[in-house]
């Protein structure tokens, strides 16, 4: 991984073979980013996406084999207790220009992953929400 500090965050380039979520979450934790936002593009392998069913309160997960263009990744960082959490959604396109998207659980860098992390400058916590079954941001 390579990175450069900016006035309000970091530009990060993940290398071939890096697991995106693990690499970026560790980067945020190592740089004490306790809240922030992330956007990115690139080319990834074997993304695993999820769709949250609000009725069953469970994720349907699906792994897509092969390489895909990362058309757009957007998300955020927060804390769950003392642990840094990355929550992001992503859209991918295949060789036929079909687009798939959802909650990103995992993906490996195929060529490059280029990301901009904006540090929030504060700590945002997540906590279980009984209504949705999700770990939501607590902003009070």
Model-identified regions with their sequence ranges:
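N-terminal intrinsically disordered, cationic/polar leader segments
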Residues: 1-86, 91-140
């Amino acid at each position: 991984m390579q990175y450069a500090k900016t006035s309000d965050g970091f530009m990060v380039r993940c290398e071939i073979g890096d697991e995106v979520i693990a690499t970026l979450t560790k980067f945020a934790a190592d740089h004490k980013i306790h809240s922030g936002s992330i956007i990115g593009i690139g080319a990834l392998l074997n993304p695993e996406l999820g769709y949250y069913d609000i009725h069953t309160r469970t994720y349907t997960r699906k792994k897509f084999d092969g390489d895909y263009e990362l058309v757009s990744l957007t998300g955020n960082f927060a804390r769950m207790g003392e642990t840094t959490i990355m929550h992001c959604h992503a859209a991918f396109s295949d060789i036929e220009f079909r687009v798939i998207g959802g909650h990103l659980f995992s993906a490996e860098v195929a060529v490059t992953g280029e990301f901009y992390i904006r540090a929030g400058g504060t700590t945002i916590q997540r906590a279980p929400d009984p209504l949705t079954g999700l770990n939501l941001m607590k902003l009070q």
